Design a protein with these regions (language model features):
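Conserved catalytic cysteine-centered active-site region
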Residues: 48, 123-170, 208-272, 305, ...
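Beta-strand segments within the central parallel beta-sheet cores of soluble alpha/beta enzyme folds
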Residues: 190-201, 256-260, 282-290, 364-373, ...
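Condensing-enzyme catalytic core mediating Claisen C-C bond formation in acyl metabolism
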Residues: 3-17, 313-407, 414-415
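Acyl-CoA/ACP chain-elongation machinery
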Residues: 281-339, 372-386, 420-427, 444-497
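Conserved small-residue
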Residues: 176, 201, 266, 273, ...
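Flexible, low-complexity linker/loop segments at domain and module junctions
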Residues: 1-9, 190-196, 408-410, 441, ...
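A glycine- and small-residue-enriched flexible loop/hinge segment at structural boundaries
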Residues: 6-19, 31-189, 206-218, 237-255
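Active-site-proximal alpha-helical scaffold in enzymes
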Residues: 171-185, 238, 242, 249, ...
Length: 532
């Protein structure tokens, strides 16, 4: 059998609640308490630069408080006064409703119960008999008040001529630029060495662009008395992140697109890139995902499913009364007593070369992405229910490690990046899957990381958060603890696993592999194998 090229990771980039992925800054923010003073200062300086602060020297607490999961900030929306239109029915009851209005604001189709009388060239009087319904703009308290947000003050659209791009696409441009800058090689030189059709780009968004500059604006414009612009529809497409990378960052002309698999979408795209490198269809592959779901409409959809941790439920978990403040930093509690996940925004990117190109150009090799396994759940009673697919992907991933590294390295040199959303169902099903997989392969004390406790759940980009953070763990020799929890829930299976609320140090030389697990809604299970 002919030798296949090995897909190696030569760069990473991205932005999420912990800061920049490049330079492993984001991982350092998550493990901040375990850093030495020099590392802490470097982390603070990186974040201060993003946040537009002149100096980090006297801003430590401000920087820490305005990163990771926290109360939703007003640049997204006001959680204490969410705008909505309340139905406002009226009855004249013998006393007609009467008001003056500018002629230009009259509806095109005058209701039959309206009597309209001209009062001037520009104004009319409206007299309404009987029943009439209005929509009254008002506001209300939002049930969910926490999200994983980009560092306060960091506005990706201000860093390039964004021209009213949706936030997810602005984040995409910044993430791709971050990865390109972190590559350490001149992109023009790479383009001269690699044929144009040998550069693949796979990046997307699980939900598309749903903020007011994308599909969100398109769907609600007329309802709110505004017009639909020509940008709303095309910029909302789910594969648009790859299009933006090709057009605005790389000028790439190779294979492109996005494969969507709910929360596993980043890994689906990584699978595409690995396949292209292995087959020789590409020598370079940019892999990414971007999600910007922190708006009231999207969050209300997840809240209606019972998926998000609400302030009321967090109060009940912590035994707080209505006058006591909820710690929004602890909203996401994987594998503990919990009540839902915490939504987040993120854009993550990795760059793959084939191993020969990496050696030829002298690229830094951060690790190898050897496999991504995808399996559906099969028949099940509910589309949201768990199934057998993730058992299969986990088993295949660990078997792949054993085939490449051998039995001893598989048992002693790895870690698992859990999906770890913070929902009651996930803590039971995923801990069962991880435990049974470890048991089947003879692994004891398998370290489990659950980074959504810091970052929140960025949907299609979530497994990208896991991948880039894993590279940071190998660099720093640090697994951030699940520090939002007091104890594991009683229904969490712990056999053969090592959960920890505390940060754990290890010698980076001992790192052999990581298994990245993702359980996408609907049965989109994906597990990736990464080698150090």
């Amino acid at each position: 059998m002919a030798r296949q090229p090995l897909p190696v990771i030569v760069s990473l980039g991205g932005i999420n609640g912990a800061g920049r992925a490049s330079g492993h800054h984001a991982l350092a923010r998550m493990g901040y308490d375990a850093l030495d003073q020099g590392q802490k200062q470097r982390t603070l300086q990186s974040l201060a630069s993003m946040m537009g602060l002149p100096s980090a020297s006297d801003q430590e607490q401000y920087i820490l408080d305005h990163t990771l999961i926290r109360r939703v900030e007003d640049n997204h929306f006001d959680v204490d006064a969410v705008l909505w239109n309340q139905r406002f029915p009226t009855e004249s009851n013998g006393h007609p409703v009467n008001f003056d209005i500018e002629r230009k604001h009259l509806p095109d189709d005058i209701p039959p119960s309206w009597k309209v009388t001209s009062t001037s060239v520009t104004h009319v009087n409206v007299n309404i008999q009987g029943h009439q319904e209005f929509l009254l703009p008002t506001n209300r308290q939002f049930e969910v008040k926490a999200a994983g947000q980009l560092p306060t003050g960091y506005e990706p659209g201000s860093l390039y001529p964004s021209r009213s791009h949706p936030r997810g696409l602005e984040m995409t441009v910044c993430a791709a630029s971050d990865a390109l800058g972190n590559l350490g090689l001149d992109w023009d030189m790479i383009q001269r060495r690699v044929p144009a059709d040998k550069v693949s780009v796979y990046a997307g968004s699980a939900m598309g662009q749903l903020d007011s500059a994308g599909a969100g604006g398109m769907l609600k414009a007329r309802y709110n008395g505004k017009r639909v612009t020509s940008k709303y529809c095309p910029l909302s497409l789910a594969e648009m992140p790859s299009d933006f990378i090709n057009a605005y960052v790389l000028g790439a002309m190779g294979s492109t697109g996005a494969t969507l698999g709910a929360c596993a979408s980043f890994l689906y795209n990584l699978k595409n890139g690995i396949a292209d490198i292995r087959s020789g269809r590409a020598r370079v592959a940019f892999i990414g995902a971007a999600e910007a779901p922190i708006n009231a409409e999207v969050m209300e959809g997840y809240a209606a499913m019972g998926a998000l941790a609400t302030e009321k439920e967090l109060r009940q978990l912590d035994g707080l009364d209505d006058n006591e403040a909820v710690d929004q930093r602890r909203a996401c509690r994987p594998f503990a007593e919990n009540c839902g996940f915490t939504i987040a925004e993120s854009a993550q990117m990795v760059v793959l070369f084939d191993d020969a190109l990496a050696m030829e150009l002298g690229a830094t090799i951060y690790g190898a992405a050897t496999d991504v396994f995808v399996n559906a759940d099969g028949y099940k009673k509910s589309i949201s229910g768990p199934g057998v697919g993730n058992y299969i992907t986990m088993a295949k991933s660990v078997a792949s490690v054993r085939a490449i590294l051998g039995e001893d390295a598989m048992r002693r040199g790895g870690l698992v990046q859990a999906h770890g959303t913070g929902t009651p169902q996930n803590r039971v099903t995923e801990s069962e899957i991880l435990s049974r997989t470890a048991e089947a392969f003879g692994i004891e004390g398998w370290p489990v990381a659950a980074l959504k406790s810091y970052l929140g759940h960025s949907l299609g980009a979530a497994s990208g958060d896991q991948v880039t953070a894993t590279l940071g763990m190998w660099h720093h020799g640090l697994i951030p603890g699940i520090n939002t929890i007091n104890a594991l829930a009683d229904d969490v299976r712990t056999d053969h696993l090592a959960f920890s609320a505390e940060h754990r140090r290890f010698d980076p030389k001992d790192a052999q592999y990581a298994v990245i697990n993702s359980k996408g809604f609907g049965g989109n299970n994906a597990t990736a194998t990464m080698l150090s």
